[in-house]
């Protein structure tokens, strides 16, 4: 089952804050909501209420993706992810993979160049090639975690997206490819007429060739 938009945002924020602000991690409901609604480094920008954040957290807790933690003597409940890299997680990611998955959850489809530029606080990539190699390992995972999208007109590089949330477009690619046969079927009468005309023309040309051969034979004899 894929993550909803709100669930994906919660997981992405917990992944991000665990690395960028470890002193504030785990996050309270208020801090998590603020992180989800950041206007920078988020796409799309959301306006989640604490109730909506709590609903996403509750759903993730039922799926064992998030757990709550409260300090001794503290009345504030805080949350941390169990999405990856814990003893309870099936998914184990390298620091490079972790950074890219986090960015894709928070900002949607991005090119390798964009991912390298935006990953500085999470992980240092030597160059774009290093990003591409990491993306390849994620794409070849079983099941695949990321997917390369077709290059958009006017863009030099293709974007990659995560396949963890419902926002991913990877599932729509086969549907787009299937539209080609339908278009061909719509044009089939026109194609059939052209084939008939072409066949008649070939037959006529063949007759003319036979006549020319006969005329040439008479001249030579």
Curated annotation (Swiss-Prot):
Residues 180-190 have a biased composition (Polar residues). Gene3D superfamilies: Winged helix-like DNA-binding domain superfamily/Winged helix DNA-binding domain (1.10.10.10). It comes from the Bacteria. InterPro entries: DUF480, WH-like_DNA-bd_sf, WH_DNA-bd_sf. Pfam families: DUF480. Residues 174-197 are annotated as: Disordered. PANTHER family: UPF0502 PROTEIN YCEH. Belongs to the UPF0502 family. HAMAP family: UPF0502 (MF_01584). This is UPF0502 protein Ssed_2611. It comes from Shewanella sediminis (strain HAW-EB3).
């Amino acid at each position: 089952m894929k993550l909803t938009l709100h669930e994906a945002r919660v997981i992405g924020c917990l992944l991000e804050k665990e690395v960028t602000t470890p002193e504030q991690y785990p996050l309270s409901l208020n801090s998590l909501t603020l992180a989800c609604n950041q206007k920078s480094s988020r796409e799309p920008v959301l306006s989640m209420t604490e109730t909506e954040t709590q609903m996403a957290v509750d759903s993730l807790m039922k799926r064992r993706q998030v757990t709550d933690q409260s300090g001794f003597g503290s009345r504030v409940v805080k949350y941390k992810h169990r999405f990856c890299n814990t003893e309870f997680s099936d998914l184990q990611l390298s620091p490079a993979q972790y950074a890219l998955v986090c960015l894709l959850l928070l900002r949607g489809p991005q090119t390798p160049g964009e991912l390298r530029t935006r990953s500085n606080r999470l992980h240092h990539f030597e160059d774009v090639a290093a990003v591409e190699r990491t993306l390849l390992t994620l794409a070849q995972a079983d099941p695949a975690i990321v997917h390369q999208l077709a290059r958009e007109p006017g863009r030099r590089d293709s974007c990659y997206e995560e396949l963890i949330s419902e926002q991913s477009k990877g599932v729509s690619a086969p549907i787009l490819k299937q539209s080609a046969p339908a278009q061909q079927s719509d044009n089939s009468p026109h194609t059939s007429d052209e084939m008939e005309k072409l066949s008649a023309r070939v037959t006529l040309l063949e007759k003319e060739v036979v006549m020319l051969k006969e005329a040439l034979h008479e001249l030579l004899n």
